[in-house]
Amino acid sequence: MSAGSRRSLLLAALLGAGVGAGALAGCASGPRHGDPERDPEVPLLAPATTPVAPHLQSFFGPGLVIRRHGSYGLERVAVRPASAGCGWRSIRVRYPAGSASQLSVERDGAPSGGAQAYLLFRDGPREDVHLSYRVRFQEGFQFARGGKLPGLFGGDHVAGGHTPDGTNGFSTRYMWRAGGKGQVYAYLPTSTDYGTTLGLGTWEFVPGRWAVVQQRVRLNTPGLADGSVVVWVDGHEVFRRDGMLFRTTPALRIEGVFFSTFFGGDDLSWASPINQYADFATFVVSDRFIEAAPAGLC
Protein backbone atom coordinates (compact mmCIF):
# COMPACT_ATOMS: atom_id res chain seq x y z
CA MET A 1 0.00 0.00 0.00
CA SER A 2 1.38 3.41 -0.93
CA ALA A 3 2.07 6.16 1.61
CA GLY A 4 -0.71 8.24 0.03
CA SER A 5 -3.20 5.39 0.46
CA ARG A 6 -2.19 4.94 4.10
CA ARG A 7 -2.73 8.66 4.74
CA SER A 8 -6.16 8.61 3.13
CA LEU A 9 -7.19 5.52 5.12
CA LEU A 10 -6.02 7.14 8.36
CA LEU A 11 -8.05 10.26 7.63
CA ALA A 12 -11.12 8.21 6.85
CA ALA A 13 -10.71 6.32 10.11
CA LEU A 14 -10.41 9.51 12.11
CA LEU A 15 -13.50 11.01 10.53
CA GLY A 16 -15.46 7.81 11.03
CA ALA A 17 -14.50 7.85 14.69
CA GLY A 18 -15.98 11.32 15.07
CA VAL A 19 -12.77 13.29 15.28
CA GLY A 20 -14.46 16.29 13.74
CA ALA A 21 -12.75 17.97 10.87
CA GLY A 22 -9.81 15.61 10.66
CA ALA A 23 -7.32 17.07 8.29
CA LEU A 24 -3.79 16.44 7.45
CA ALA A 25 -6.01 18.89 6.43
CA GLY A 26 -14.03 32.48 -17.13
CA CYS A 27 -10.86 34.37 -15.85
CA ALA A 28 -10.51 38.10 -15.13
CA SER A 29 -7.50 39.99 -13.89
CA GLY A 30 -7.54 41.60 -10.45
CA PRO A 31 -9.53 44.75 -9.84
CA ARG A 32 -8.57 48.34 -9.27
CA HIS A 33 -9.41 50.24 -6.06
CA GLY A 34 -13.02 49.82 -4.99
CA ASP A 35 -13.68 46.65 -6.97
CA PRO A 36 -15.20 43.54 -5.36
CA GLU A 37 -12.13 41.46 -4.77
CA ARG A 38 -9.89 44.14 -3.28
CA ASP A 39 -8.54 42.43 -0.22
CA PRO A 40 -6.40 44.37 2.29
CA GLU A 41 -6.06 41.97 5.20
CA VAL A 42 -3.66 41.89 8.12
CA PRO A 43 -0.06 41.47 6.92
CA LEU A 44 0.98 37.85 6.62
CA LEU A 45 4.04 38.29 8.79
CA ALA A 46 2.39 40.39 11.51
CA PRO A 47 2.34 38.79 14.98
CA ALA A 48 -0.96 37.15 15.85
CA THR A 49 -3.13 39.23 18.18
CA THR A 50 -4.18 36.07 20.04
CA PRO A 51 -2.32 32.86 20.83
CA VAL A 52 -2.99 29.76 18.79
CA ALA A 53 -6.39 28.45 19.90
CA PRO A 54 -6.00 24.97 21.45
CA HIS A 55 -9.64 24.11 20.75
CA LEU A 56 -9.11 24.72 17.03
CA GLN A 57 -5.80 22.86 16.89
CA SER A 58 -7.62 19.85 18.32
CA PHE A 59 -10.43 20.30 15.79
CA PHE A 60 -8.15 20.42 12.74
CA GLY A 61 -6.16 17.44 13.96
CA PRO A 62 -2.44 16.61 14.14
CA GLY A 63 -1.76 16.87 10.42
CA LEU A 64 -2.42 20.63 10.26
CA VAL A 65 -0.49 23.00 12.51
CA ILE A 66 -1.86 26.50 13.19
CA ARG A 67 0.92 29.01 12.59
CA ARG A 68 1.36 31.76 15.17
CA HIS A 69 1.71 34.56 12.62
CA GLY A 70 -1.06 36.13 10.55
CA SER A 71 -4.01 34.87 12.59
CA TYR A 72 -6.98 36.78 13.94
CA GLY A 73 -10.43 36.09 15.37
CA LEU A 74 -9.70 32.53 16.45
CA GLU A 75 -11.04 33.17 19.95
CA ARG A 76 -14.45 33.83 18.39
CA VAL A 77 -14.60 30.51 16.52
CA ALA A 78 -16.70 27.95 18.38
CA VAL A 79 -16.37 24.18 18.01
CA ARG A 80 -19.80 22.54 17.86
CA PRO A 81 -20.71 18.90 18.54
CA ALA A 82 -22.01 16.64 15.82
CA SER A 83 -25.70 17.19 15.13
CA ALA A 84 -28.27 14.46 14.58
CA GLY A 85 -27.84 12.81 11.21
CA CYS A 86 -24.51 14.45 10.36
CA GLY A 87 -21.85 12.60 12.31
CA TRP A 88 -19.19 15.31 12.36
CA ARG A 89 -18.22 18.24 14.51
CA SER A 90 -18.14 21.70 13.00
CA ILE A 91 -16.83 25.16 13.73
CA ARG A 92 -18.95 28.29 13.61
CA VAL A 93 -17.54 31.62 12.40
CA ARG A 94 -19.57 34.77 13.06
CA TYR A 95 -19.79 37.91 10.94
CA PRO A 96 -21.25 40.75 13.04
CA ALA A 97 -23.38 43.40 11.36
CA GLY A 98 -21.07 46.04 9.89
CA SER A 99 -17.98 43.82 9.80
CA ALA A 100 -15.74 43.50 6.75
CA SER A 101 -11.96 43.16 6.34
CA GLN A 102 -9.45 43.82 9.12
CA LEU A 103 -8.53 47.09 7.41
CA SER A 104 -12.06 48.33 8.06
CA VAL A 105 -11.53 47.62 11.77
CA GLU A 106 -8.38 49.74 11.87
CA ARG A 107 -9.46 52.45 9.45
CA ASP A 108 -13.21 52.77 10.02
CA GLY A 109 -13.72 51.45 13.54
CA ALA A 110 -15.88 48.62 12.22
CA PRO A 111 -16.48 45.52 14.34
CA SER A 112 -14.11 42.64 13.74
CA GLY A 113 -15.68 39.64 12.03
CA GLY A 114 -14.67 36.35 10.50
CA ALA A 115 -11.37 34.62 11.26
CA GLN A 116 -8.03 33.78 9.70
CA ALA A 117 -5.25 31.24 10.28
CA TYR A 118 -2.50 29.57 8.27
CA LEU A 119 -2.66 25.78 8.74
CA LEU A 120 0.68 24.22 7.78
CA PHE A 121 1.03 20.62 6.59
CA ARG A 122 2.89 18.85 9.38
CA ASP A 123 4.52 16.45 6.91
CA GLY A 124 5.85 19.23 4.71
CA PRO A 125 5.02 21.11 1.48
CA ARG A 126 3.53 19.47 -1.61
CA GLU A 127 3.09 20.10 -5.31
CA ASP A 128 -0.27 18.45 -6.06
CA VAL A 129 -3.00 18.53 -3.40
CA HIS A 130 -6.73 18.01 -2.95
CA LEU A 131 -8.47 20.03 -0.20
CA SER A 132 -12.06 19.20 0.73
CA TYR A 133 -14.34 20.66 3.40
CA ARG A 134 -17.99 21.33 4.09
CA VAL A 135 -19.48 24.80 4.47
CA ARG A 136 -22.99 25.86 5.42
CA PHE A 137 -24.29 29.42 5.52
CA GLN A 138 -27.08 29.98 8.02
CA GLU A 139 -30.70 30.04 6.88
CA GLY A 140 -31.47 33.48 5.48
CA PHE A 141 -27.79 34.34 5.03
CA GLN A 142 -27.37 37.68 3.28
CA PHE A 143 -24.40 37.37 0.95
CA ALA A 144 -24.26 41.14 0.24
CA ARG A 145 -21.39 41.87 -2.16
CA GLY A 146 -19.18 38.96 -1.20
CA GLY A 147 -16.58 37.47 1.10
CA LYS A 148 -13.71 34.99 1.43
CA LEU A 149 -13.56 31.25 2.10
CA PRO A 150 -10.60 28.91 2.81
CA GLY A 151 -8.28 27.54 0.13
CA LEU A 152 -4.66 26.42 -0.34
CA PHE A 153 -1.52 28.57 -0.19
CA GLY A 154 2.25 28.63 -0.42
CA GLY A 155 4.78 31.35 0.43
CA ASP A 156 4.18 34.79 1.94
CA HIS A 157 2.55 36.87 -0.81
CA VAL A 158 -0.91 35.32 -0.67
CA ALA A 159 -3.34 38.12 0.25
CA GLY A 160 -3.77 41.76 1.17
CA GLY A 161 -2.50 43.19 -2.11
CA HIS A 162 0.88 41.45 -1.87
CA THR A 163 1.01 40.39 -5.51
CA PRO A 164 3.37 37.40 -5.87
CA ASP A 165 6.23 37.33 -8.36
CA GLY A 166 6.52 33.58 -8.92
CA THR A 167 9.02 33.03 -6.11
CA ASN A 168 7.25 34.28 -2.99
CA GLY A 169 3.67 33.01 -2.87
CA PHE A 170 0.27 32.08 -4.27
CA SER A 171 -3.17 31.21 -2.88
CA THR A 172 -6.45 29.73 -4.10
CA ARG A 173 -9.15 30.79 -1.67
CA TYR A 174 -12.78 30.79 -2.68
CA MET A 175 -15.17 33.72 -2.56
CA TRP A 176 -18.91 33.85 -2.21
CA ARG A 177 -20.44 36.67 -4.20
CA ALA A 178 -23.84 38.38 -4.49
CA GLY A 179 -26.66 35.87 -4.56
CA GLY A 180 -24.38 33.08 -3.32
CA LYS A 181 -22.35 32.73 -6.53
CA GLY A 182 -19.06 30.94 -6.00
CA GLN A 183 -15.60 31.47 -7.49
CA VAL A 184 -11.91 30.82 -6.93
CA TYR A 185 -10.02 33.95 -5.90
CA ALA A 186 -6.37 33.28 -6.73
CA TYR A 187 -3.19 35.21 -5.98
CA LEU A 188 -0.89 34.45 -8.91
CA PRO A 189 2.20 35.95 -10.58
CA THR A 190 -0.18 37.02 -13.37
CA SER A 191 -2.51 38.88 -10.98
CA THR A 192 -2.62 42.67 -11.07
CA ASP A 193 -3.13 44.78 -7.94
CA TYR A 194 -4.99 42.05 -6.05
CA GLY A 195 -6.30 38.56 -6.86
CA THR A 196 -7.60 36.94 -10.03
CA THR A 197 -11.23 35.85 -10.47
CA LEU A 198 -11.69 32.29 -11.73
CA GLY A 199 -15.00 30.61 -12.53
CA LEU A 200 -17.38 33.24 -11.16
CA GLY A 201 -20.91 31.83 -10.99
CA THR A 202 -20.04 28.27 -12.01
CA TRP A 203 -21.71 27.14 -8.77
CA GLU A 204 -23.91 28.68 -6.07
CA PHE A 205 -24.11 28.33 -2.30
CA VAL A 206 -27.59 27.75 -0.83
CA PRO A 207 -28.24 29.13 2.69
CA GLY A 208 -29.09 26.46 5.24
CA ARG A 209 -27.59 23.65 3.16
CA TRP A 210 -24.20 21.99 3.57
CA ALA A 211 -22.01 22.02 0.46
CA VAL A 212 -18.90 19.87 0.00
CA VAL A 213 -16.30 21.96 -1.82
CA GLN A 214 -13.09 20.39 -3.08
CA GLN A 215 -10.21 21.95 -4.96
CA ARG A 216 -7.19 20.33 -6.53
CA VAL A 217 -4.16 22.53 -7.08
CA ARG A 218 -1.36 21.12 -9.22
CA LEU A 219 1.62 23.45 -9.38
CA ASN A 220 3.30 24.16 -12.68
CA THR A 221 6.74 22.98 -13.70
CA PRO A 222 9.03 26.02 -13.31
CA GLY A 223 9.49 27.51 -16.77
CA LEU A 224 6.19 26.10 -18.04
CA ALA A 225 2.56 27.19 -17.63
CA ASP A 226 1.24 23.68 -16.98
CA GLY A 227 -0.40 24.07 -13.56
CA SER A 228 -4.10 23.65 -12.89
CA VAL A 229 -7.01 24.27 -10.53
CA VAL A 230 -10.08 22.03 -10.45
CA VAL A 231 -13.18 22.55 -8.25
CA TRP A 232 -15.85 20.03 -7.36
CA VAL A 233 -19.05 20.83 -5.44
CA ASP A 234 -20.93 17.89 -3.92
CA GLY A 235 -18.76 15.58 -5.99
CA HIS A 236 -19.49 17.22 -9.36
CA GLU A 237 -16.78 19.05 -11.28
CA VAL A 238 -17.88 22.67 -11.72
CA PHE A 239 -14.68 24.44 -12.77
CA ARG A 240 -11.32 23.61 -14.34
CA ARG A 241 -8.48 25.85 -15.45
CA ASP A 242 -5.36 24.40 -17.06
CA GLY A 243 -2.25 26.16 -18.36
CA MET A 244 -1.72 28.06 -15.11
CA LEU A 245 1.45 29.66 -13.75
CA PHE A 246 1.92 29.59 -9.97
CA ARG A 247 5.70 29.74 -9.64
CA THR A 248 9.04 30.21 -11.36
CA THR A 249 11.11 28.24 -8.83
CA PRO A 250 10.80 24.68 -7.49
CA ALA A 251 11.37 26.03 -3.98
CA LEU A 252 7.81 27.43 -3.90
CA ARG A 253 5.36 24.68 -2.97
CA ILE A 254 1.92 24.23 -1.40
CA GLU A 255 2.46 24.72 2.33
CA GLY A 256 -1.01 24.34 3.80
CA VAL A 257 -4.58 25.57 4.13
CA PHE A 258 -5.30 29.30 4.23
CA PHE A 259 -8.30 29.38 6.60
CA SER A 260 -9.62 32.84 5.74
CA THR A 261 -13.23 33.97 5.93
CA PHE A 262 -14.74 37.44 6.23
CA PHE A 263 -16.91 39.90 4.29
CA GLY A 264 -14.94 41.96 1.79
CA GLY A 265 -13.69 43.74 -0.09
CA ASP A 266 -11.74 46.66 1.36
CA ASP A 267 -14.45 49.06 2.55
CA LEU A 268 -17.73 49.08 4.42
CA SER A 269 -19.79 48.74 1.24
CA TRP A 270 -18.80 45.05 1.59
CA ALA A 271 -19.84 44.75 5.23
CA SER A 272 -22.19 42.10 6.55
CA PRO A 273 -25.66 43.69 6.70
CA ILE A 274 -26.76 41.66 9.76
CA ASN A 275 -25.33 39.46 12.49
CA GLN A 276 -24.86 36.07 10.82
CA TYR A 277 -22.61 33.02 10.68
CA ALA A 278 -21.26 30.13 8.61
CA ASP A 279 -20.32 26.62 9.71
CA PHE A 280 -17.31 24.61 8.47
CA ALA A 281 -16.57 20.90 8.86
CA THR A 282 -14.55 17.87 7.70
CA PHE A 283 -11.35 19.49 6.42
CA VAL A 284 -9.44 16.76 4.59
CA VAL A 285 -6.24 16.96 2.54
CA SER A 286 -5.14 14.14 0.23
CA ASP A 287 -3.03 13.34 -2.82
CA ARG A 288 -6.13 12.00 -4.61
CA PHE A 289 -9.83 12.77 -5.08
CA ILE A 290 -11.67 12.81 -1.75
CA GLU A 291 -14.98 10.96 -1.73
CA ALA A 292 -17.57 12.79 0.38
CA ALA A 293 -21.30 12.24 0.06
CA PRO A 294 -23.41 15.42 -0.16
CA ALA A 295 -24.72 16.34 3.27
CA GLY A 296 -27.61 18.57 2.26
CA LEU A 297 -29.81 19.60 5.18
CA CYS A 298 -28.49 17.20 7.84
Report residues per predicted region.
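N-terminal secretory signal peptides and thylakoid transit peptides that target proteins
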Residues: 1-16
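Low-complexity, Ser/Thr/Pro/Gly-rich disordered linker/stalk regions
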Residues: 18, 27-211, 215-298
